[in-house]
């Protein structure tokens, strides 16, 4: 098997293949020569340069790591930059780019994935973990989207939920926001401008000197009436997997607005029984969650980076709650027969360590979790590794695929994939197949 070559970029971002060095990868703190697991760069994936990061290759004659701190192309010398891949929906990262920091800034918040150059073109280290096609990028940001947005804004001219979704759909190309305008599948209902966590990798609120936030946070929380107006219209008319979800990347923690959301759910269900009502949450406030379940919430998707309390709290930096409160909310949702999914923020070399996998398996089995939605954590890799070290979570990783296989064997009922399950899909066979492909 011809091993993929190292990729690097010029200061201007032009990606090039090294003539001799092979690609290295990172798993946690370790730089490695991977033995397998790469696949052709998927359609809609893209290669990006990592500013301030030097690429690390492998000398094919000695097998040793080699730092590439200078490159020559066309008679000109320059300091090269490392290259990674950004994956489309339906794929899960298994390894990180092989790179070291050279005094650059914190990287923007993307899920950087190891990449190289194979015989037929670029390759990346990832798994295909969900083959359903309703989140395929070609279905979004189409030529008709502006017209659909205008029609919705004309129908609901004063609605602040729709005003926020307009921004998210156009500026950030948020698929869940766009679905509201396409009237299909899972649609976003942002609700909260405040949060009770200070996630290190928060995409809508970063401290001074941190990575630039990739989204502007919702500035003015909408009323129950505004949320109900958009939610009811979507559930009543959406094609496909009709669902609305409170809790989006552009906002804080929706449980902090449980009273308004509960009122909105009651109003929605007074007009339609169609579709599913979900919340994406940190599950910090079990009393607030109970109020939503009482009002008609039927699905809960709980975001976590770890089922290990120390690493969870090191990343989420909770204010006014602890890991035990998250478990209490999971137990409550399970008791109330809600559909319970984990939004699992994966990081190769940390999430797949023996200790982390053991804690996750115990959580899934203890509460008979319905689904694990794999998410590649969007963060500067070196920034998250520092969090993991402080939490004592820097053991050797054993591989993301092995982690998912361990979940499958311990919990054969568990659905593993990337996307939410519509009501009718929740009773079907698990998504996972041992050969991800």
For the regions a protein language model found, what residue spans apply to each?
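Conserved strand-turn element in the central/C-terminal portion of the radical SAM core barrel
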Residues: 317-319, 329-356
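Short cysteine clusters
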Residues: 195, 199-202, 246
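Active-site beta-loop-alpha junctions enriched in small/polar residues
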Residues: 249-251, 282-284, 305-307, 345-349, ...
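Core AdoMet radical
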Residues: 186, 190, 206-263, 269-288, ...
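Alpha-helix-loop-beta-strand connector modules within alpha/beta enzyme cores
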Residues: 258-274, 323-338, 392-417
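Auxiliary Fe-S-binding modules of radical SAM enzymes
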Residues: 1-156, 358-437
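Catalytic cores of alpha/beta
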Residues: 287-294, 349-366, 428
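N-terminal [4Fe-4S]-dependent radical SAM core
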Residues: 105, 110-189, 206-210, 214, ...
């Amino acid at each position: 098997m011809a091993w993929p070559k190292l990729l690097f970029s010029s200061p201007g971002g032009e990606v090039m293949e090294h003539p001799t060095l092979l690609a290295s990868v990172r798993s946690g703190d370790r730089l490695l020569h991977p033995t397998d697991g790469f696949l052709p760069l998927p359609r809609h994936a893209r290669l990006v340069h990592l500013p301030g990061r030097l690429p690390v290759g492998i000398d094919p004659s000695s097998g040793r790591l080699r730092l590439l701190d200078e490159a020559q192309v066309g008679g000109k010398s320059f300091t090269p930059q490392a290259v990674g891949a950004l994956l489309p929906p339906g794929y899960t990262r298994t390894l990180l780019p092989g790179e070291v920091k050279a005094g650059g800034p914190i990287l923007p918040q993307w899920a950087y994935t190891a990449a190289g150059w194979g015989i037929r073109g670029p390759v990346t280290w990832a798994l295909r973990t969900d083959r359903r096609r309703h989140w395929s990028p070609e279905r979004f940001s189409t030529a008709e989207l502006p017209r659909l947005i205008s029609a919705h804004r004309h129908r609901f001219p004063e609605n602040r939920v729709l005003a926020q979704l307009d921004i998210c759909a156009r500026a950030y190309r948020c698929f869940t926001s766009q679905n509201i305008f396409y009237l299909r599948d899972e649609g976003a209902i942002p609700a909260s401008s405040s949060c009770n966590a200070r996630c290190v990798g928060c995409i809508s609120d970063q401290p001074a000197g941190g990575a630039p936030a990739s989204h502007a946070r919702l500035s003015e929380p909408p009323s129950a009436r505004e949320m109900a107006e958009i939610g009811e219209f979507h559930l009543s008319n959406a094609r496909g997997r009709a669902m609305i979800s409170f809790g989006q990347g552009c906002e804080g923690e929706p449980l902090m607005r449980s009273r308004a959301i509960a009122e909105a759910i009651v109003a929605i269900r007074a007009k339609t029984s169609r579709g599913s009502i979900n919340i994406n949450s940190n599950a910090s406030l079990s009393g607030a969650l109970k109020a939503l379940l009482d009002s008609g919430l039927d699905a809960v998707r709980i975001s976590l980076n770890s089922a290990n309390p120390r690493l969870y709290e090191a990343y989420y930096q909770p204010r006014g709650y602890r890991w035990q409160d998250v478990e209490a909310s999971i137990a409550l949702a399970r008791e109330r027969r809600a559909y319970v999914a984990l939004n699992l923020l994966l990081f190769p070399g940390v999430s797949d360590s023996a200790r982390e996998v053991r804690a996750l398996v115990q959580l899934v089995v203890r509460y008979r979790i319905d689904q694990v939605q794999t998410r590649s954590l969007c963060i500067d890799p070196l920034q998250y590794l520092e969090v993991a070290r402080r939490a004592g979570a820097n053991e050797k990783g054993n591989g993301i695929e092995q982690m998912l296989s361990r979940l499958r064997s311990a919990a054969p009922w568990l659905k593993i994939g990337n996307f939410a399950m519509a009501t009718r899909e929740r009773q079907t066979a698990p998504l996972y197949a041992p050969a991800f492909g």
